[in-house]
Each structure stands twice: as structure tokens, then as C-alpha cells.
């Protein structure tokens, strides 16, 4: 079979789609979840171990839900009331009644609803480590333990509410991506395991009405895009990463088939002759498919479109498939893949490698098979013919020995190259160590210089501090001197001012005295002519007052 589904890869979603198995997404059957708890490792939806601890704030609620589920009445175990707070959390969406949450979401702005989706995307990315993983597992357990999430109740959900519930159940954050717009019916089908959760597939389940045991019993499994061993899907097409069963058309990851022992050497009958070939045993139907022809078909149809990196990756897949092959053609293909990988790593153009591998497949097709001489049975073989057959056997043994020798030489060459690479790496590391030592010495010298500069600056600071103290004391002394001189000058000024005022007062006194005397003399002359006058009495009082001054 050719690689699965030659469909274009959906643009813009590769980073937001994770590989998740149905078990990791939370199967309604607790036994199913426990049986494959170690299979999902690519997203926070991986199953928790028995040592996981749940958040204590909701531990009692979780135990109650589990107990009611065991007793068979989980349909009525949904919490009926939401807290009176205006805030709503992802736990409320996962736990509370559908109609109540839907009604509240219709009254919330779109920006607030986007916050829920962003918060869940952050949890699904798992960047918060164990805390985010535990939070997601707790949300998933809440959703999976509910019995009221049916077609009838999910049809009334708010769009954002339904997207969050589907993302929690599947563990795929693509359902929260702004560019992904699935219908409400499709989201409900995905939630109820009626439709493939792979957005690029979207087939109704069971796909193609398959009635095999895996499709019938494994919830959410799609045989068109999922591996029958790990139950995961991806967007790899035109690749040897997937192996398809020729009989039941189910697909398996090459890595899963190798690790699960589904690839080995077995008998194959072609043209009436029995020979050993590398076979793939399907995990779904337990029947075998031949791998060499499948690899040839993949390379013939898809190799011309591969770049060098993809070509090396595909050759590595083929190399690991035929690594333990015991048939001659499988061993030749294994050696050829190793040879081409080495050449591509050394810079050989990928179109040339494509031509080489395709011509190699043609050589394998025209390689004559061993013929069986059925018509010679029962008769004696001539000596010359016996010698020829012995020679053929010897030639075949020599060819095998040469092939083994070539393989050993290649291994020795690879070991020598690895040794040379190690020696070169040691030399590089030695140079790096020398450089680091020199750098360390230089840094040490710089540190010493900086320390000496710091000490010098500290000494300068101490000196400046000392000078500042002396200057401060000198300023205080000068201030005291200036203050004393100011006080003395003020006293001198006051003394001179008082003396000046006193001399002025004396002069004025003398002037008034002279004036009074003059007036007295004039009045005396007048009084001799006339009697006492009231003004004479006033002058006498003024004279007494001046004398007192």
C-alpha cells in the first residue's frame, strides 16, 4: 500500500495540533484508560500515573463523582449551582450544568470568552510543567465523569463552551484556534466519539464502516489516519513513516511497528518457490504484508519530490525496517540505505541519490532467483555438473563473505571516521580550554586592575574627605571670625552713631539755650517796661527743662 491519504497538509495548524491517543483523551471506560496510560507523551493530555496528586480544593468533589459513577447514577451527579461570584473559570465550565454556563456565556463579551480559550491553550501547551499537566488532567476527569453530556444537552451549548469541552476531552488545542471553524454538529460528533478528531480527516466513525475489533471497541479510533498501536495521528504523507496493511488497509507508524516487534523475517511463496522475506504483521488483522515492494512503490511515487533532509529521513526509516532482515535482498537494501545516507551527509545531490536508489530497486527486480532443478530429481549428477554446482556454492559463499567483509569495512570506516571526529573534537575542546584559560587570566588581570583602581579611588575619596573636613573647619572658623567682626563693627557703628547723636543733641541744646537766653534778654527788657506776662512763665519752664536735659 502507498502512504496514507495523499491530502494537503492544513496550513497554519501544524504547531497547534498534537498527537493524542483516545485513551489519553479520556475514554469513558476506566479500564481502557488504565490499560494504555503510558502511550500518550506528546501533549498535556497524556494519562496520569498512579502517583499523580489532584488539587486539594476539588479533591472531595472528584472522589464524590467517582463514587457515584461506580454506583451507577452519574447522570444526576452534576452540580446544580454556580458560585454567586461574577467570575467564571475553566473548572466551572467543565463541572457545571450546560444550560447555566451557556446562559452566562451569552451575557459575557467576546474578549472575556477569548480569555478562557487562551487560558486552556496555555494549559494544553504544557509550558507550566507538572502544574499545567495536573490541572488539565483534573479538568479532563471532571468532563469524563459527567453523564449529562449527550446530544440533547450539547446542542444548547454556547459555541465557546462546546469548543472548550471538546478541547478538554481530546487534548487537542486546534479546536481553540481562531482559524478553525467546525460546525456545532461536527464538534458534538467529535466529543461523542462519532467523528474522527483529526481535523484534516473528519471521517464518521467507524471509518468505512469497519467492523474489526479495534474499530469496534476503541472509542475515537479512525483507521484512515490513526496508528493501530499508539492510536495517534499526524500529517506525514508521501512517507515511509506509515506502513499500511495490504489486506485490511489499517495503518501503523513505522516506529511503533519496529518497537512492537511487528516487523521480521518470514517465509514467502512466489512463483511456487518458498523464500525468506522481511514481512510486516498487522496488529489489527494479524496478517502479513511484504515490505520490500511497499518501500519500492513509496520511493518510485514519492522520492522525486523529497529534499535532501526528507530523503535522509526516509532512508533512515528503511534502514531501521531492514536492520534485522535475514534475507539477501533485505540485507542489500539495508547496506544501500546506509551507503546513501553517508553520501547524502557528505554532500551528494539528492537527485543523484534518487536515481541510485531507483536503479537499485530495478536491479533487485531483475536479479535472477535460484532455480530448482525439479526435472533432475532421481538421476545421478555428472562429475562436471557437480563441480559446477560446488563452484556455484563456493562463489555464493565468497560473495556472502565479500559482502560481510564490505560491511565490516564500512563499519571500520565509520568507526575510524567517528574516532577522527572524536580526536578533532578533543583538539577543538583543548583549544577551547586554552582559550578559556587565557580569557580567565585576562579577566583576572582586569579584575586586579579594577581592584587597584578601586583602591586608588578609595584613597582619593578618603583624601578628599579629609580635605573637605579641613575646609569645613576652616569655613566654620572664618564664619566665627566674620561673625565676631560683624558684631564688633555693629557695636562701633552704634557707639559712633550714639556719639554723633549726642553731639548733635548738645549742639541743638546749645543752640536752644542761646536762643532762649536771647529771648530772655529781649523779654527782660520788655518786662521792665510792662508787668508779668504768661509767655514769660512758659519760657522759664522751657529753660528749666533744657537744664534738666
From Swiss-Prot:
UniProt protein name: OBERON-like protein
GO molecular function, one term: zinc ion binding
InterPro entries according to UniProt: OBE1-like_PHD, OBERON, Oberon-like_PHD, Oberon_cc, Znf_PHD
Extent of Polar residues compositional bias: 28-38, 45-56, 521-538
Record carries keyword Cytoplasm: no
Presence of keyword Ribosomal protein: no
Localization: Nucleus
Coiled coil, from the record: 394-520
GO biological process, alphabetically ordered: maintenance of root meristem identity; maintenance of shoot apical meristem identity; regulation of gene expression; root meristem specification; transport of virus in host, cell to cell
Subunit structure: Self-interacts and probably forms heteromers. Binds to VPg of pea seed borne mosaic virus (PSbMV), turnip mosaic virus (TuMV) and lettuce mosaic virus (LMV), but not with VPg of tobacco etch virus (TEV), cowpea mosaic virus (CPMV), tomato black ring virus (TBRV) and grapevine fan leaf virus (GFLV).
Pfam families attached to this UniProt entry: Oberon_cc, PHD_Oberon
Role: Required for the maintenance and/or establishment of both the shoot and root meristems, probably by controlling the expression of the meristem genes and of genes required for auxin responses. Involved in the development of the basal pole and in auxin-mediated root and vascular development in the embryo. Confers sensitivity to turnip mosaic virus (TuMV) probably by promoting viral movement and multiplication via interaction with TuMV VPg.
CC terms in the record's Gene Ontology section: nucleus
Segments of this protein annotated with the region Disordered: 1-56, 519-549
Gene label: PVIP
Keywords: Coiled coil, Developmental protein, Host-virus interaction, Metal-binding, Nucleus, Zinc, Zinc-finger
Zinc finger regions, PHD-type: 224-288
Domain of life, source organism: Eukaryota
